[in-house]
């Protein structure tokens, strides 16, 4: 997007990193949103919830995501080649409902980097009594329900046409609808395709100033936010890019901090993890050792620290991909994928991991190849073979990895054509996007033929069949 005025500014981007959400208002007229609302009413009454077919069933909703403010916010957070994924859902909150419990849509994932987000659109004015989505700011950094304070809940109220961009891991719920009216919220899932190399928002200053952040944040909160900010700026981790209070290696201090990982609350342990990361390469051996723990929480804390350390951790993580225990191999693969571009030396080891006996290792290895190997075709033949894996999560991650490689994946067009009939709907959907990004004449022909035969007619219904 060329017009910088529609991109987020530095303060909005910092708020997104800290709180996990940002809200924008479309330029579309009130009449447009009223028409979306009425079409939604008609579809729900006559056919029920269209689920993933929401967009082809009500195609005018695409205008919301073509809006310059919405496009600008999505570009700012995910980069200009962001991807509207096949999963979307219209959430209906009926009159006099009790609402939902707080939850995360994405499950308990490890990474703090923004590779996935949700866009929430209201086609009607949504005051608090109508049961808006409630969110817990800053909760996307935590995977345990006990870490979340319900008293911090904020209702996402707004006029018709309000769109809130949230981190996929943000804890949220439908709040009680105490009114006599219906509330609809259209939820769409988006993914980052390219690892950040430069800021994609209207960036004026690449420095992170703690004075811009809430006084309630701890020193280690700021370290965490700063790390994510630097990642979004495309500054390679592992090069001492943020100030450190550590003046010299201290093996005793490192050992003391590592030993208490997992012995306190999740927020405190994540604070400790980012504090350990400031020791850089000196902390790597002790942190990699923690990947051997049978506690998923401890492995995640080590993952956070190793991801922040970056390139100096790559060699030890490559070695860990050969560990006898599957969870160590899986954790190493996931950490390498999260480090991203700086972990390119791991590509051969991750290709080897595609033959691992553990489904979890294969899932994470193919995903990692999509974030690490984005600038060459080395992994493409092996990723194409993984499209035939018996595990559907491996196939899903493989096809998305090929989509991320884009034109470098041109050798996989025939393999992608085969999975357009996969049993998993998301493998099919992501294969369409992979072909679009490959964009060779062969890929375009395969794509056009598939879309012609799978065309959806939004005017056809049981009342009007032809």
Question: Residue locations for each model-derived region?
Answer:
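Structural detector for internal amphipathic alpha-helices that build alpha-solenoid repeat scaffolds
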Residues: 226-249, 267-282, 289, 297-312, ...
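Non-heme Fe(II)/2-oxoglutarate
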Residues: 175-259, 269-270, 280
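Buried hydrophobic core positions in alpha-solenoid tandem helical repeats
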Residues: 256-258, 286-288, 316-318, 349-351, ...
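Catalytic core of non-heme Fe(II) oxygenases with the double-stranded beta-helix
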Residues: 98-157
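Non-heme Fe(II)-dependent double-stranded beta-helix
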Residues: 1-109
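Short inter-helical turns and helix N-cap capping residues of alpha-solenoid HEAT/ARM repeat scaffolds
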Residues: 264-265, 294-295, 324-325, 357-358, ...
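Conserved metal-binding segment of the jelly-roll/cupin
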Residues: 157-171
